[in-house]
């Protein structure tokens, strides 16, 4: 199944049923008076977060979703039947945005969470409501109200506690295979991973967190190179970043410069994102002679001016992986507990994530508009530099993001 993380849909809530004008007709009851019932209420449209879907691909092919119209009223003061509400299933981590106002209607981050996105119309009134002392036989009834019509954008961001970042072939997919049951494709060429992969890292009884393997970034990604920022937005909901650096690249490149590329791209794309807590992981230590390893790792850390936490691993053999798992679990648990115990800290965390998501959304849309303008100019014959931005409408990837237990 294709991984689709954006879709624009049109939703129409159900129209309300019409009220009717009718009169009581019963033997031995002359001038029975009005008995027209009201119309039913039109169905609302909701989105509901489900864990059995991980892509918005269905909304690429079915872009219009209408709730049913309610029934008209009936005689004998019987109201018409309201129409059923329409529920649109979306993956956990979906944000709903009104395309006309750019208002964020809500985020769905829990299984079963629902969000009202279009309200059904109220039913019309039957002629019973218009009876008065001067008008005992009203023939007036009102029509039902129309349901809301909206054009919305669904944006999917994977929900993970930890985001794996690094250049292509840094060992991210191998790492997530080591720590979870996720099985992303692994190969010795760049861009093996084309879509985010999620894995649940199980530490023990009731202790686990979710890790996301984000497709590799390259220099210029914030301006559209390679996979561009197409999937960088998926780290917007992570608590911290795990930055993997290949200390012995097969192409002979400098690991220090490779690490700086990622740090610079994060800063260019979103300063708020670059300020997330980061852990540096020096990977593939099994590829360096033991007598040279300590000197090389010390050199990399010093050249980067890194003052944060550093781990050394060999993801292929699993060396050093457990230490990272337990460190991450302890940090995440402390943060979760503090959010529960300290309302001020919880509010600050929420505000930070809201700022981050707003910044990511703004930057993503700005780059998409620049890409569209460049493509339009190219069609008109303007000489433009090559633009490799991967527009979401042209996504042909064939992999689905899957939660692995």
From Swiss-Prot:
Obg domain location: 1-159
UniProt KW Nucleotide-binding keyword: yes
Cofactor(s) annotated in UniProt: Mg(2+)
Domain of life: Bacteria
Residues forming coiled coils: none
Positions of region (Disordered): 371-405
Pfam name, any one: GTP1_OBG
InterPro entries: G_OBG, GTP-bd, GTP-bd_Obg/CgtA, GTP1-OBG_CS, GTP1_OBG_dom, GTP1_OBG_dom_sf, OBG_GTPase, P-loop_NTPase
Keyword annotations: Cytoplasm, GTP-binding, Hydrolase, Magnesium, Metal-binding, Nucleotide-binding
One GO term (biological process): ribosome biogenesis
Domain OBG-type G: 160-333
Leading EC class: hydrolase
Binding residue positions for Mg(2+): 173, 193
Biased composition (Basic and acidic residues): 371-382
General function of this protein: An essential GTPase which binds GTP, GDP and possibly (p)ppGpp with moderate affinity, with high nucleotide exchange rates and a fairly low GTP hydrolysis rate. Plays a role in control of the cell cycle, stress response, ribosome biogenesis and in those bacteria that undergo differentiation, in morphogenesis control.
Family: Belongs to the TRAFAC class OBG-HflX-like GTPase superfamily. OBG GTPase family.
Name of the molecule in the record: GTPase Obg
């Amino acid at each position: 199944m294709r991984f689709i993380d954006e879709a624009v849909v049109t939703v129409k809530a159900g129209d309300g049923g019409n009220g009717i004008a009718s009169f009581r007709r019963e033997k031995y009851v002359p001038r029975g008076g009005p008995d027209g019932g009201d119309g039913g209420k039109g169905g609302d449209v909701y989105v509901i977060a489900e864990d059995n879907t991980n892509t918005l691909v269905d909304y690429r092919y079915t872009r219009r979703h209408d709730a049913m119209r309610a029934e008209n009223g009936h005689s004998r003061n019987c109201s018409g039947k309201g129409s059923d509400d329409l529920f649109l299933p979306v993956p956990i981590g979906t944000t709903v945005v009104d395309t006309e106002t750019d208002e964020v209607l809500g985020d769905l981050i829990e299984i079963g969470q629902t969000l009202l996105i279009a309200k059904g119309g109220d039913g019309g009134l039957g002629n019973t409501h218009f009876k008065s002392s001067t008008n005992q036989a009203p023939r007036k009834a009102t029509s039902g109200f129309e349901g809301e019509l909206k054009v919305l954008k669904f944006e999917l961001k994977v929900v993970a506690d930890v985001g794996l970042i690094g250049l292509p072939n840094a060992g991210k997919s191998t790492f997530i295979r080591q720590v979870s049951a996720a099985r992303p494709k692994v190969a010795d060429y760049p861009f093996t991973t084309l879509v985010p992969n999620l894995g649940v890292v199980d530490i023990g009884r009731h202790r686990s967190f979710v890790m996301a393997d984000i497709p590799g970034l390259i220099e210029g990604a914030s301006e559209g190179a390679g996979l561009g920022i197409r999937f960088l937005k998926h780290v917007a909901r992570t608590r911290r970043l795990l930055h993997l650096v290949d200390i012995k690249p097969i192409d002979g490149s400098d690991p220090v410069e490779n690490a700086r590329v990622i740090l610079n791209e994060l800063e260019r794309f979103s300063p708020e994102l670059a300020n997330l807590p980061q852990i540096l992981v020096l990977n593939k230590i099994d590829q360096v002679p033991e007598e040279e390893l300590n000197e090389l790792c010390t050199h990399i850390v010093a050249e980067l001016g890194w003052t944060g936490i550093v781990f050394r691993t060999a993801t292929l053999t699993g060396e050093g992986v457990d230490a990272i798992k337990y460190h991450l679990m302890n940090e995440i648990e402390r943060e979760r507990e503090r959010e529960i115990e300290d309302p001020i800290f919880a509010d600050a965390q929420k505000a930070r994530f809201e700022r981050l998501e707003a910044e990511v959304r703004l930057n993503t849309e700005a780059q998409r508009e620049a890409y569209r303008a460049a493509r339009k100019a190219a069609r008109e014959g303007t000489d433009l530099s090559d633009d490799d931005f991967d527009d979401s409408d042209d996504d042909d990837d064939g992999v689905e993001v899957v939660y692995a237990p």
